[in-house]
UniProtKB/Swiss-Prot annotation:
Subcellular location: Plastid, Chloroplast thylakoid membrane
Binding partners and assembly: The phycobilisome is a hemidiscoidal structure that is composed of two distinct substructures: a core complex and a number of rods radiating from the core.
Membrane topology: Peripheral membrane protein
Domain (PBS-linker): residue spans on this chain: 11-191
Name by which UniProt lists this protein: Phycobilisome rod-core linker polypeptide cpcG
Domain of life: Eukaryota
GO biological process: photosynthesis
Purpose: Rod-core linker protein required for attachment of phycocyanin to allophycocyanin in cores of phycobilisomes. Linker polypeptides determine the state of aggregation and the location of the disk-shaped phycobiliprotein units within the phycobilisome and modulate their spectroscopic properties in order to mediate a directed and optimal energy transfer.
Gene Ontology CC terms, in alphabetical order: chloroplast thylakoid membrane; phycobilisome
Keywords: Antenna complex, Chloroplast, Membrane, Photosynthesis, Phycobilisome, Plastid, Thylakoid
UniProt xrefs under PANTHER family: PHYCOBILISOME 32.1 KDA LINKER POLYPEPTIDE, PHYCOCYANIN-ASSOCIATED, ROD 2-RELATED (PTHR34011)
Family that this chain belongs to: Belongs to the phycobilisome linker protein family.
Thylakoid in keyword set: yes
Organism classification: Eukaryota, Rhodophyta, Bangiophyceae, Cyanidiales, Cyanidiaceae
Amino acid sequence: MAIPLLYYPYSSQNHRVNSFEIKGNDEQPRIFSTDSLPTSSEMDEIIWAAYRQIFSEHQILKFNRDTYLESQLRFNQITVREFIRGLLLSERFRILNYDVNNNYRFSEMCVQRVLGRDIYNDKEKIAWSIVLCTRGIKAFVDSLVNSKEYEENFGDNTVPYQKRRVIFQRSKGEVPFNLKTPRYGSDFKERLGMPQYAWQGAIRTFRPQEIKPRPGDPVLYLDMSRELLFSRFR
C-alpha cells in the first residue's frame, strides 16, 4: 500500500496573500495559454515557455527538445498539462535533474517549476520526497500535475509560471527559481569535482619563465632519471 502525501503546514508566501494589483501591468507575469486558439507563432512561444519553465533557462537546448510531444500539442492531441507531464517524465529531464540530485532537492525543484511557488517548509519537502522514493518518479509527477493546486492555478491549458514573483508593495521581486535552485546542489558539486580543483593543481605546477631550471639544476636530473626509468617499459 502506497504511503499518502504526509501533512505539512502552510506558510505565508506572496501567492497566498490577497492581491490589490492592477491586472495587465508590469508586475503581472505573462501568461502563455491555448485558451484563445493560438496561431503558429503563438504556439511556438507557448512551447518555448514550457521548456523554459520545466527545464530552466540553463537547459533550453535543441538536443533536449521532444519533437513528438510538440507535434501532439500543435495538433491538439494533448493539452498543455499533458505536455508538461511529458517533459517531466522525459529521459532528458531525468538525466539533467533527477540523476544529479537527491530526492529532497529534486522534490523542491519540481514543486517550484510545476506549482509555480516555493516549498512552504522542510516538512513539505520531506512529504514529497517520500512520495518520490516510495512510488517512483512517474507517480510523483502525476501527483503534482493532477493536484488540486495545479488545477486551480493553471488548469489544462496554461503553462505554469512563478506566481507573484514581483509585487507592487516591494521594491525588489523574489529571486527566480532557476537562479535560486540551480541544477546542481553543493553536495553533488563536491562529488563531481568542479574545475577549480583542476585550476589549483595547474597553478601549483606552473613555473614562471624567470625561475625555470637552468643547466646544472638538480631538478633536471630528476626528470632525466624518470625518463630513463620509464624508457625500460616502452
